[in-house]
């Protein structure tokens, strides 16, 4: 079924849409606006409701109104007057009631009254309009009527008559409503510029004049008169406004004068009275002479809208420029008066006008502190905040003390102390703690809690000469085969191990005995509690033995002497005891303080006695530690692992080290990612005297560095970065600069050749040992320059650096990566790989000796005597000679000796035997020779032949 919208129903019934919407709501329909749609049946109900209402109205008006079929006289019925802007509508004759079913109202509206009748005020009789109209029937009737009219006009219309065409155009729409009038007006305005149209319009006006009974109205003159009247009225109102504004201004001026006079009088009263009382200024009462000023802004009387349509004409208000300027002045003055005198409102600008004044709060008095802890560089504002005083007060005190300062100026310590003395406060300087200083944890007395101290395992370092059995002894103690795993059978880095004896733990550190590992032995002695000095019974005291004794004495560590290899036939323990006594190590049997134990590490002889001695000495020392504090300790060894990164072997000395602890190790920092003990097992906690290997550091630390655990990772990072920055600055400051004092040494050093070396090793201790050993090599005229040293495999960056610095890469217990090996082959960079340290030293020493310039000595190989000379043009002088001793060779150098004096020293140009070129002429034979660059050869000259031979070193 089809639907209809409410506005379509309204159009059919000739009703307004809102009436249809209202009627639909009365019928109980859910509609919202005239655009709502309803079913066809519902639409019929709405139409039927209006039809029933129409019948009810028609029944009531039948007795009062005449029947609609009776004709109505419309000659005396004038239409409504039209507006001035629109033209007069065409007066058309009314059709008869029989010929047209149109309503009476439409027929009467088609005969508009003339202007004369409107002026005379002729009233038209009232016509009763029906409540509803059948628009469809009306449209059909109009269509028929228009068709008949067109037919009649077409028969009577002459050819080429423009006036008839205009009449037909005007008569096409007989509805004299507002839309047709506006359309005709627009069309007429568009054709005003056409002269032919103007003539036709004049004819049309003349024809229209015949229909209108009365004189023609001049609309232009009427509009001009209306505009003149409006301008005059506007001028009169402007003059009145100007006079009113002037009067208001004078009244305001007088009022301000009276207010100023009242203020002056109050001021004089306050000066004369000793204790003035607060009074509100009296406002003078308005008198009869002072008229009340109406400061309210009046609404401007805007001229009629009709005069705006004639602003383009010459007689408009634009002509009155002088009056307009005066009007603007009056308007501005009035606006200013209105703004000055307007009533106060509750708003942002006047929110406190009527508010009661708050009582003045007294400042709280703060007592001065008894003590003040200060730092150098504190500002006046900071001091004022600390002692709860105003900065201006402190600035004043400083000014009285002779110190000119502002609140943002820094003060030194002496000035702050003087200021506190003036206030009666005891000043103390704050001791600033360097967060990057790890050493403070080892020396601070308050760091360790004396009540929480517990017994800890002793740390024992095994020291001695190379190949005296240190690692074999430790191997026996651990029941393992550590010695067989070392390259060359010697220990080349510190090993940290822990064993259990009698229910008690003992931590052992195995140090290298080779001369190159002096720094390692010193590092081991600094962290140990007891030193076991291993001496072979057949070798006795050796250089590294003496060095170990000195390290132990420097660290004030007790020494236990283990005389090893007593199972050998040539063992002599008594000789060893005597030799040690010469170096200050006395046995307890001889009145000393060192314990001596004769052992055989190979056959496990007297090992238990040695361990009992260690525990006894440790018990005497009363070794204790606090496991409750954050862990501190020392780096035993460090290396760079390909899969794990930086790996450091730490010895915990105080506290407890846990996994995930933020830690600072030397100049590096990080978080403990994982911990493993000496057996390779992962642990989460490491107590005092426990050696562990950790990962998680950002770089590889140096062996011997201290470490400390911080409260959080942020503090650890800040401390580590600060330590790295300080180390770099210290390294830069250590660079020597050329001065007048060392200029000669610098020039002399430039003549010395150098061997550039890049060292890569498996652990940090080996790097240090190699660097120290290579720098100790003494070869006259050659020195070793270590370009770079690090831990880890040889990589591409090492090869690139070696190529740029012309260096040799030495790898100790490491191997180059495949990419580094290929790059080294293409760049011709030499890589030497070793696993035994003394072989590295020998090889570098040979290379240094090979870099020296060879030394040569002169060797005379023969003499010849000139017997004849021949001068050949373009060749030179040829000397015929005879060898009197030795031989003369082609590549030998010669000297020309005349009367025992060397005349010339040079090289042979040619050597011949008769006409043949020969390489040498032996003793007793003759030949000819020429000397390069020399032709003054004479008879009886002696030719001495010699060569330069290299001297072997």
UniProtKB/Swiss-Prot annotation:
Q: Which InterPro entries match?
A: EF-G-like_DII, IF2_II, IF2_N, P-loop_NTPase, Small_GTP-bd, T_Tr_GTP-bd_dom, TF_IF2_bacterial-like, TIF_IF2
Q: Name one Pfam family in it.
A: IF2_N
- Is Cytoplasm set as a keyword in this record? yes
Q: Where, by residue number, does GTP bind?
A: 464-471, 510-514, 564-567
Q: Where is this region: G3?
A: 510-513
Q: Which UniProt keywords apply?
A: Cytoplasm, GTP-binding, Initiation factor, Nucleotide-binding, Protein biosynthesis
- Which domain of life does this protein belong to? Bacteria
- Using the UniProt annotation, give all residue ranges assigned to the region (Disordered): 53-368
Region G2, residue ranges: 489-493
Classify the main location: cytoplasm
Compositionally biased region (Basic and acidic residues): 135-151, 162-190, 236-266, 301-318
Annotated segments matching region G5: 600-602
Q: Indicate where this protein resides in the cell.
A: Cytoplasm
Q: Where is the composition biased (Low complexity)?
A: 191-214, 274-288, 332-341
What range(s) does the tr-type G domain occupy?
Answer: 455-622
Region annotated G1 sits at 464-471
Q: Which GO terms describe its molecular function?
A: GTP binding; GTPase activity; translation initiation factor activity
Family of this protein = Belongs to the TRAFAC class translation factor GTPase superfamily. Classic translation factor GTPase family. IF-2 subfamily.
Please identify the protein, giving its name as recorded.
Translation initiation factor IF-2
UniProt source species: Streptococcus gordonii (strain Challis / ATCC 35105 / BCRC 15272 / CH1 / DL1 / V288)
Q: Gene that codes for this? A: infB
């Amino acid at each position: 079924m089809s639907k209809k919208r409410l506005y379509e129903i309204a159009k059919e019934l000739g009703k307004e849409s809102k009436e249809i919407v209202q009627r639909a709501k009365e019928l109980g329909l859910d509609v919202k606006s005239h655009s709502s749609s309803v079913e066809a049946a519902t639409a019929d109900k709405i139409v039927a409701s209006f039809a029933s209402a129409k019948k009810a109205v028609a029944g009531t008006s039948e007795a009062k109104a005449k029947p609609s079929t009776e004709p109505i006289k419309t000659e005396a019925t004038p239409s409504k007057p039209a507006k001035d802007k629109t033209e007069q509508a065409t007066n058309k004759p009314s059709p008869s009631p029989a010929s047209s079913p149109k309503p009476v109202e439409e027929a009467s509206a088609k005969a508009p009254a003339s202007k004369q009748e409107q002026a005379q005020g002729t009233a038209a009789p009232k016509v009763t309009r029906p409540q509803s109209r059948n628009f469809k029937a009306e449209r059909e009737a109009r269509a028929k009527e228009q068709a008949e009219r067109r037919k009649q006009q077409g028969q009577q219309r002459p050819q080429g008559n423009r006036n008839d065409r205009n009449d037909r155009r005007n008569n096409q729409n007989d509805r004299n409503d507002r839309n047709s009038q506006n359309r005709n007006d627009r069309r007429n305005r568009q054709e005003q510029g056409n002269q032919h149209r103007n003539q036709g319009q004049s004819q049309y006006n003349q024809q229209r004049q015949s229909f209108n009974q009365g004189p023609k109205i001049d609309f232009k003159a009427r509009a001009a008169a209306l505009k003149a009247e409006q301008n005059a009225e506007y001028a009169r109102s402007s003059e009145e406004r100007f006079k009113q504004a002037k009067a208001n201004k004078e009244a305001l001026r007088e009022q301000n004068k009276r207010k100023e006079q009242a203020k002056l009088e109050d001021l004089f009263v306050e000066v004369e009275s000793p204790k003035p009382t607060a009074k509100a200024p009296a406002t003078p009462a308005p008198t009869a002479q002072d008229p009340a000023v109406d400061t309210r802004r009046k609404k401007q009387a805007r001229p009629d809208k009709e005069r705006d349509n004639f602003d383009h004409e010459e007689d408009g208000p634009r002509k009155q420029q002088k009056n307009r300027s005066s009007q603007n002045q009056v308007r501005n003055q009035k606006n200013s008066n209105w703004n000055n005198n307007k009533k106060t409102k509750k708003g942002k600008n006047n929110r406190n006008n009527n508010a009661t004044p708050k009582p003045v709060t007294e400042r709280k008095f703060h007592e001065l502190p008894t003590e003040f802890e200060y730092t150098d560089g504190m500002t006046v504002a900071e001091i004022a905040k600390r002692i709860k005083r105003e900065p201006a007060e402190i600035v004043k005190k400083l000014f009285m003390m002779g110190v000119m300062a502002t609140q943002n100026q820094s003060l030194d310590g002496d000035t702050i102390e003087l200021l506190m003395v003036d206030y009666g406060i005891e000043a103390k300087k704050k001791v600033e703690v360097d967060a990057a200083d790890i050493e403070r944890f080892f020396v601070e007395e308050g760091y360790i809690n004396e009540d929480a101290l517990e017994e800890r395992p002793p740390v024992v370092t095994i020291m001695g000469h190379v190949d005296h059995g240190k690692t074999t002894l430790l191997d026996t103690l651990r029941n393992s085969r550590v010695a067989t795993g070392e390259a060359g059978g010697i220990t080349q880095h510190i090993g940290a191990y822990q064993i259990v004896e009698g229910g008690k733990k003992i931590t052992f550190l195995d140090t290298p005995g080779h001369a190159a590992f002096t720094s390692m032995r010193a590092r081991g002695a600094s962290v140990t509690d007891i030193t076991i000095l291993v001496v072979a019974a057949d070798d006795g005291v050796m250089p590294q033995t003496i060095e170990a004794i000195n390290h132990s004495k420097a660290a004030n560590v007790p020494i236990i002497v283990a005389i090893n290899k007593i199972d050998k036939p040539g063992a002599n323990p008594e000789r060893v005891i005597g030799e040690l006594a010469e170096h200050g190590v006395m046995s307890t049997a001889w009145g000393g303080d060192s314990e001596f134990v004769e052992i055989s590490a190979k056959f496990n002889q007297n090992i238990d006695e040695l361990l009992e001695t260690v525990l006894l000495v440790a018990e005497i020392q009363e070794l204790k530690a606090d496991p409750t504090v954050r862990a501190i300790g020392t780096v035993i060894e460090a290396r760079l692992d390909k899969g794990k990164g930086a790996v450091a072997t730490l010895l915990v000395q105080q506290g407890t080290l846990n996994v995930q602890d933020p830690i600072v190790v030397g100049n590096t920092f990080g978080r403990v990612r994982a911990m493993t003990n000496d057996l390779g097992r992962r642990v989460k906690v490491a107590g005092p005297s426990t050696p562990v290997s950790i990962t998680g550091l950002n770089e590889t630390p140096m062996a011997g560095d201290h470490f400390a655990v911080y409260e959080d990772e942020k503090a650890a990072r800040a401390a580590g970065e600060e330590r790295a920055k300080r180390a770099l600055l210290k390294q830069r400051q250590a660079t020597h600069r050329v001065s007048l004092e060392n200029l000669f040494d610098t020039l002399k050093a430039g003549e010395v050749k150098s061997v550039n070396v890049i060292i890569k090793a498996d652990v940090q201790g080996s790097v240090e040992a190699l660097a120290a050993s290579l720098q100790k090599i003494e070869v006259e005229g050659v020195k070793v320059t270590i370009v770079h040293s690090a831990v880890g495999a040889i990589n591409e960056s090492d090869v690139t650096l070696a190529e740029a610095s012309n260096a040799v890469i030495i790898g100790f217990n490491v191997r180059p990566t495949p990419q580094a090996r290929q790059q080294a082959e293409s760049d011709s960079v030499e890589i030497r790989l070793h696993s035994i340290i003394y072989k590295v030293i020998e090889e570098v020493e040979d290379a240094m000796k090979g870099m020296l310039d060879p030394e040569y000595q002169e060797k005379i190989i023969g003499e010849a005597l000139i017997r004849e000379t021949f001068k050949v043009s373009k060749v030179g002088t040829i000397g015929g000679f005879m060898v009197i001793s030795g031989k003369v060779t082609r590549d030998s150098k010669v000297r020309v000796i005349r009367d025992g004096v060397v005349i010339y020293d040079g090289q042979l140009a040619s050597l011949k035997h008769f006409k043949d070129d020969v390489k040498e002429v032996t003793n007793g034979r003759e030949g000819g020779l020429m000397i390069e660059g020399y032709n003054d050869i004479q008879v009886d000259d002696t030719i001495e032949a010699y060569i330069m031979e290299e001297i072997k070193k």
